[in-house]
Structures are given as C-alpha cells and as structure tokens.
Amino acid sequence: MKIINIGVLAHVDAGKTTLTESLLYNSGAITELGSVDKGTTRTDNTLLERQRGITIQTGITSFQWENTKVNIIDTPGHMDFLAEVYRSLSVLDGAILLISAKDGVQAQTRILFHALRKMGIPTIFFINKIDQNGIDLSTVYQDIKEKLSAEIVIKQKVELYPNMCVTNFTESEQWDTVIEGNDDLLEKYMSGKSLEALELEQEESIRFHNCSLFPVYHGSAKNNIGIDNLIEVITNKFYSSTHRGPSELCGNVFKIEYTKKRQRLAYIRLYSGVLHLRDSVRVSEKEKIKVTEMYTSINGELCKIDRAYSGEIVILQNEFLKLNSVLGDTKLLPQRKKIENPHPLLRTTVEPSKPEQREMLLDALLEISDSDPLLRYYVDSTTHEIILSFLGKVQMEVISALLQEKYHVEIELKEPTVIYMERPLKNAEYTIHIEVPPNPFWASIGLSVSPLPLGSGMQYESSVSLGYLNQSFQNAVMEGIRYGCEQGLYGWNVTDCKICFKYGLYYSPVSTPADFRMLAPIVLEQVLKKAGTELLEPYLSFKIYTPQEYLSRAYNDAPKYCANIVDTQLKNNEVILSGEIPARCIQEYRSDLTFFTNGRSVCLTELKGYHVTTGEPVCQPRRPNSRIDKVRYMFNKIT
C-alpha cells in the first residue's frame, strides 16, 4: 500500500481543520462531520483550540482511498506556533496551502509558503470558502501571483454563487504556465506542432515536485464542494519520500505529547524498513529502546498495531525518546533543508495562584517544556522564583490555558522582559590553586578571557599539553566552562569572547574529572569579574510588506520603536521595508502595523544578532547548582 504524509497549512480561520474533517468524511474514514464551532473535530483536541477555533498543536489523523493511505498533519496557523509548523514540515511528502477566497493571501500564508519553498515541499493551493457571496477569483489569483508565486496553474473552472459548480479544465489554456516554463515545449508550441497531453502532464509533475509550479484547486470544506476531486488529486499527485525495497530501519521523532493519564508519547515518521512490536531499536546511534506499545492512525482513530512500514507515522509510548531523535540508521534520513526554530526572546516569572500547587506546577512545566523546545524554565536559587523563557505572548496564553485545563493549575505571570547576553569588556586572567582555601576541589585551573567582535560567539582553546593533563580532565574543564558561560555576571549567557585554559594541576590518584568540571565555572566567574561584562540585547532583521498607501505611516513610526529602515522597494503596488529592530520593540511595532493597515501588512523577522545596550544593566537571577553555589559564595566574599 502506498503511504503519503501531507500537511494542511493556512492562516488563522482559513478552514484547515474543517477541510480535514471533510477529507475524512468523504473518504469514508468517519461517518459524521465534526464541527469547529461545536468542538467536535478530530484534530483540535485542547479546550483552547476548540474555544478559539484555531490549531495550536500538530494534529494527526488519516484516511484510506483505494490503495493509498493518507496521513494528514493539521498544522498550527498562528505566528507563535511556527516551531510546531517547522517540525511538522520535516516529515511531509507534500502540502495543501489553504487560501480563503474571501480574505485572500494573509500574512501567515506568506510565512508558511516561504517555509514550504525553503524546505522543498511540493505544494497545492486550495482556494477555500468559494461559496461565500462577493467572491472575485480573478482577484485571488492575482493576489497569489503577486504575494506567493506567479508560477501557478489553474486546474478547474468555477461557477460561483448561486450556481455553485467546480469542474476540471479540459481546455489547453490551463497548460500555458507549463509550456512557458519549458523552452523545448515553448519552441514546439510556437512552431505550430501539437503537444501531447502526456508530455504536458509529465512536465507539470516534474515542476510540481521540484517546487517550481503550484496547481490551484477550489472548493468549500464547510459545504463539501470540490472535496472528492481534492482527494483524487492528493492520492495521485503526491509521492512518498521513502526508501523502496528492503532496507534498514530509519525513523525520526517529530512530536512529543503527554496524555491525560500522563503517558509520554513519541510521534515518529518512518523513512525506511519495518518496525515490529518488541523490537530493540538503536536511537541516534547510541542507546537502544524496546518497542512495547505501538499505535498509528487508521481512518481517523488511533489503533494498536504490531508492525509499521516505511512511510508510516507511528506513536510509541516511551520515556526516553527526544524531539529529533533518529531510530535506526541515521544515514537513511532524507537530506531536507532545515529552518532554524526561532530562539526564545522573552522571559517572565510564574507562580501558582495557590502556593500549595507549586510542585504540581513544576511537574506540569517539565512535561510542557519536554514537548515544546521554545519553552524553558528554571528555579532561581536565591528567590526560588520559577523563571520561564518563551517566544511570544500568545504562546504564554496557551501555556496558561493548558496548565488550567490539563493540569488544573492556575498561574500568575509578571510582565515579560527580553533575554539579553553578556560580553567581556577587557582581557583578564585568573587562577584558583589546589589546596588553597576556599577551593575544596582537587584541581587547579587558570583561565584567560578576551572580548571578540559582536557575532563571533564563544571560542575556547587549551594551551595545556595533553601530556601534562590528560584528555578526560581537559574535557571536564571545557564542559565546566560551557556551563559557566550560561550565566555571566548579570545572569545572562556569555558570548563573543575567547576563553583560554592556560594552567591546570591535579593530584594523582585523588583528582577526578568532576573536580575540574566543578571548579571551571567558578574560575570563569572570577575572571569575568576582573574583565567586567557589558550587556547585549537581541536585534531582529525585518522585512515589512505593506500596501503603498501605508508607506508614510510605517516609515515614520519606525523611530518610535527604535527600528532602523535601511532599504525600501516598490513591487506590485506593495512596499517592502527592510531594516533592524530591538527584539523588545517588535511586538508593539508588529501590532501597530497590523492595526493601521487593517491586517494587510506582513512583518517577517529573524534574529540578526546582538548589539551593546545603553542604560542600566538588566539582571537575571542565577540558576541553582547545589554543588558549586556554596563555593561561589565563598570566593565572592574574598574577591
């Protein structure tokens, strides 16, 4: 049986969850349509998803059509959940990008399409909600050409309200874009020679799968228009990106989820081989795990299985698998372009509304952060506050609602602040000697630190000979320094500097690598105190796409948000502003743009780097380490 994995992507409220329901219903996987409004859909599982009518976590379901099984990945559609989207994209064989016939191409549509093209995923455009009044498809087509890609091929003829009808094109006009993109076909056409349908279809298929051509289909998911045709297109047009024939096992973990009974589930895409129940499988070429329970989606329901084949998405109950773990042979994993997940740029303090629920809150955060790499937390060793770092405010709203709905814990949040970094101000050296109080470790370490240009990162070198200090001790020093760099003088990560291990001494046989590992961050803190550090704040590069009539407002408002516009371009009655902005200002600037352009602007950002801040330094509480905090305190008293 052919197995394909497709993604359903769209901006908020374009109808992707409703489309998923229609695909399941028309294929016979379910006997009754679920409703977003009634909260009965198969893929929006949390209360917050049902209340808002938006997808927050990746939902997975499936249907079978003739000899093809289709796994559907119903991905999130909000800016703050792009990490979920990117993880899901890595397992797809193809994508359906929904565009609302009423709303056209929205900001989120452009961001998602950018990701799909960057990762090389064949994509179909599905224009949804064509049953609404006042639809002008020619305007939607033009919108797609200007904002997404001009390389589209319209596959259907559409009669709009009130005589709703969608039929496949049979005329030659649908092939214009295909012919124009191939010199041989164009020359043949211009010379008056006839073109066979087969060669046109082959050319379309080639360009579709190399992501240089995008077929356009139409329908209404809510009223079941065009869905049967879309099912045929999905099963015939997409290929499975799996190894054919006998091969070793290879699979990749792309999602971690906890059930209401606190069972930990790992979602895995199999790329080759066969996975059997009770198999012992090597993970990321290291430890092995035993498969004790295995599930997959069959016609919209999760079912236990005893084997799974290449191309399948399986779910294992396992406590040790992590996101991006590879099961089996890592060499068989497809080489697909990656999109870096955005870094958490905000932090805040969280406490339970009821103090007696503190342990419940910590247990819940452990599970949530395990599932979401963009949420990190620690407990301050001095104030005992719980510190969270995260990506955006909507993400925090979702976590708050999840804590209340699933874990029955209400929380109180402080106003979030930006996550900074630190860089040494000058060169400095410091040595802590063995058996010299208050050093309790059987190790001597001497370090030097030098500032480097912005963007250089942390560089480490050792000038201590391996003949003098063996590799295990040297590795322990490097590990301790990397740990120490996580918290500088103000509590932020240390970067843009060179740290040199200049001196080391051990006593045989009492010294161990642990002595060097524990002492290294203490020496690093002392050398940073001699050098001093300056605070660096994150800056984002941005591209703003806005209608030409809003140029003046967008440009003039930039200084108010500390934004520096470095380039302005005009394209298709749209202005593209490029520049950079402090991360602490982007949320307000983006909200302002959305407000005064009535949602017609797009603001794409990525981390550019860090700049030196001015003004009073912002401090972050240190994370606790019971083994070295007391020694740190003693050294800080004497220096």
Curated annotation (Swiss-Prot):
Gene3D superfamilies listed in its UniProt record:
3.30.230.10, 3.30.70.240, Elongation Factor G (Translational Gtpase), domain 3, P-loop containing nucleotide triphosphate hydrolases, Translation factors
- Does Cell wall biogenesis/degradation count among this protein's keywords? no
- Pfam families listed in its UniProt record: EF-G_D2 (PF22042), EFG_C (PF00679), EFG_III (PF14492), EFG_IV (PF03764), GTP_EFTU (PF00009)
InterPro entries in UniProt: EF-G-like_DII, EFG_II, EFG_III/V, EFG_V-like, G_TR_CS, P-loop_NTPase, Ribosomal_Su5_D2-typ_SF, Ribsml_uS5_D2-typ_fold_subgr
Q: Write out the residues that bind GTP.
A: 10-17, 74-78, 128-131
Q: Name one GO molecular function term.
A: GTPase activity
Q: Which CDD domains match?
A: Tet_C, Tet_II, Tet_III, Tet_like_IV, TetM_like
Domain tr-type G: from-to ranges = 1-242
Task: Write out the GO biological process terms.
Answer: response to antibiotic; ribosome disassembly; translation
Q: Which SUPFAM superfamilies match?
A: EF-G C-terminal domain-like (SSF54980), P-loop containing nucleoside triphosphate hydrolases (SSF52540), Ribosomal protein S5 domain 2-like (SSF54211), Translation proteins (SSF50447)
Which keywords annotate this record?
Answer: Antibiotic resistance, GTP-binding, Nucleotide-binding, Plasmid, Protein biosynthesis
Q: Which residues cross the membrane?
A: none
* Family according to the record: Belongs to the TRAFAC class translation factor GTPase superfamily. Classic translation factor GTPase family. TetM/TetO subfamily.
Q: What does this protein's UniProt record list under function? A: Abolishes the inhibitory effect of tetracyclin on protein synthesis by a non-covalent modification of the ribosomes.
What's the name of the protein? Tetracycline resistance protein TetM
